[in-house]
Swiss-Prot record:
Protein family according to the UniProt entry: Belongs to the protein kinase superfamily. Ser/Thr protein kinase family.
Organismal lineage: Eukaryota, Viridiplantae, Streptophyta, Embryophyta, Tracheophyta
PTM comment, free text: Autophosphorylated.
Residues where Phosphotyrosine is found: Y449
Phosphothreonine modification, residue list: T272, T298, T435, T436, T441, T452, T532
Keywords: ATP-binding, Cell membrane, Glycoprotein, Kinase, Leucine-rich repeat, Membrane, Nucleotide-binding, Phosphoprotein, Receptor, Repeat, Serine/threonine-protein kinase, Signal, Transferase, Transmembrane, Transmembrane helix
Active site residues of this protein: D402 (proton acceptor)
InterPro entries recorded: Kinase-like_dom_sf, Leu-rich_rpt, LRR_dom_sf, LRR_N_plant-typ, Prot_kinase_dom, Protein_kinase_ATP_BS, Ser-Thr/Tyr_kinase_cat_dom, Ser/Thr_kinase_AS
EC class name: transferase
Record's subunit section: Interacts with TMK4/BARK1.
Protein name per Swiss-Prot or TrEMBL: Somatic embryogenesis receptor kinase 5
Amino acid sequence: MEHGSSRGFIWLILFLDFVSRVTGKTQVDALIALRSSLSSGDHTNNILQSWNATHVTPCSWFHVTCNTENSVTRLDLGSANLSGELVPQLAQLPNLQYLELFNNNITGEIPEELGDLMELVSLDLFANNISGPIPSSLGKLGKLRFLRLYNNSLSGEIPRSLTALPLDVLDISNNRLSGDIPVNGSFSQFTSMSFANNKLRPRPASPSPSPSGTSAAIVVGVAAGAALLFALAWWLRRKLQGHFLDVPAEEDPEVYLGQFKRFSLRELLVATEKFSKRNVLGKGRFGILYKGRLADDTLVAVKRLNEERTKGGELQFQTEVEMISMAVHRNLLRLRGFCMTPTERLLVYPYMANGSVASCLRERPEGNPALDWPKRKHIALGSARGLAYLHDHCDQKIIHLDVKAANILLDEEFEAVVGDFGLAKLMNYNDSHVTTAVRGTIGHIAPEYLSTGKSSEKTDVFGYGVMLLELITGQKAFDLARLANDDDIMLLDWVKEVLKEKKLESLVDAELEGKYVETEVEQLIQMALLCTQSSAMERPKMSEVVRMLEGDGLAERWEEWQKEEMPIHDFNYQAYPHAGTDWLIPYSNSLIENDYPSGPR
């Protein structure tokens, strides 16, 4: 009996392994089909070079994220210069939650089969040249929250089936769609900007008891006016020159720019209980951050800026705020809106459920688990992607100037979200000496910025490198407490000394309790040292950092740097020789899937 049970157990294990392999192979086949459709040009082949048809699962491939069951949950191929068409085989990824193929050169139609991706939360196909209709099958995606199809060549009518979806974000503007805008379902919450620059008819007005001729004239007038408003709104969005009248808070209109809103002071006073001290989430050099609850029960974080008011700065403030709002990436804190009165400047963000990396490392409540090593790796990658977007993909480059663990926020699934970007410029929009006014936090400020006051994207790279050391050690970038042990008060200097004299484990946060991979720690230290080189020119760009974190080029860059720096740095790098970067892809055990932040800071 015992022997039979053992044999049955073995067969069960073999069967489960077989099922796993079959499932994995199906996913491999689906992604290879996608690669075949998109593999035009050397750049594409390089982007997808790790996609190997001989693999059992695709979970080790670049730009692919899996869950603990080795099921693909995310494809990250935005802004990858891809061309070709989507393939119906994508439906063979049943656990896919995030499909990101935005800002490429993709043509053809959206496959009907995407409607079979029942776990899909976000579909981002914007800024391509996709044609044909929006498939009505997308209406089956009961978990879809983010649908962004704008800046394509889509035609036909908006499927009525989409109105039943629980959408938080919808943007199908700048296409060739026609017909009526549905008025039922979740569509009612979206402004005209979500549908702008199409051939769509506005939502029908209620019938009037006036004579038929007058009614017809009214309808024509409404339609013409709506069309004019659509065009004007689209122009405002593209040119970033929107202007809101600064009226007293009690009379503030509800003004939207896409999903971006001007809030009234009254509703933010109610949301924060008149900026109650018990709602304070944090205080920084830009102002105080409060937790708030809007009338629809949505949690937000409201930053009450402390900058000095000057006459005539309202339009410039609005322009800068709107510029910040246009930076949309899942690793950037999304600006929901603002409030401006003669006496107040406020910014409204989604509430970040898990606070900041700094608070998770050093201020976590008793009973809350420490950030584990896989999460720390994912935070390193996510924050790098967000900064790279600010530097390379915004209409106007945004330099953060204060990259640190306290400004890397974590949503409910511990996805890293870069916060407070754009505020350095926003708070100095009327300062003629902005180029020489040093901003930042001691311990994170790049040496060239400190000495000259001149910043560049390499200033952010330095701050990012120090933030990596915060992730590894759990310590502050500047800490007078280290003087008690005759250690350097600057984290970067302390790390270098420890590398000279002590073992690697002396650096790693004790909160990890030894649960980390030594080679991975070494590689993140290598990355941090490359990013914090004294010469700004020698530091990598954030886009290069992302590529190295994804497994491309760290070993070569590190070897090159060692040859140049060995006479200067007096510690034995050969004691830590591991240069492999396989782990640096988005880790396959990730449960981090949320596309938009929603919680405290």
